[in-house]
Amino acid sequence: MMDFAFKDLKVWHKAVEFADNAISLSENLDTDRKHYRLVEQLESASASVSMNIAEGKGRNSKKEFIQYLFIARGSLYETVTLAVIFNKRQWISDKDLEKLETEAIEIASMIKGLINSIYKTL
């Protein structure tokens, strides 16, 4: 049976957990269904972090992997921005925002470390 190399990455596991937490948070939002597109975007952007890490790991070169890690980081920042907007609209609590931001900071640091370690091997 084939093993997927991205499953060996701790950052991928953290990103999957981050997406699960963000999606769980979005399921409890009370937006009167007026802003469904924003809620959907939060779910999509949060899932995109782990998806881009996995896709990049499956690419042919280290440079391509780095590019996908940058895309993953962009999706992470997008998710945090949406969470800040949701907090301003009082759709999520300060505590929920802080939890997401704390997870995002850890993941961003891990992505940066992975990028730097790959650069050293080029």
Language-model regions, residue ranges each:
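Amphipathic alpha-helical assembly/interaction segments
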Residues: 1-122
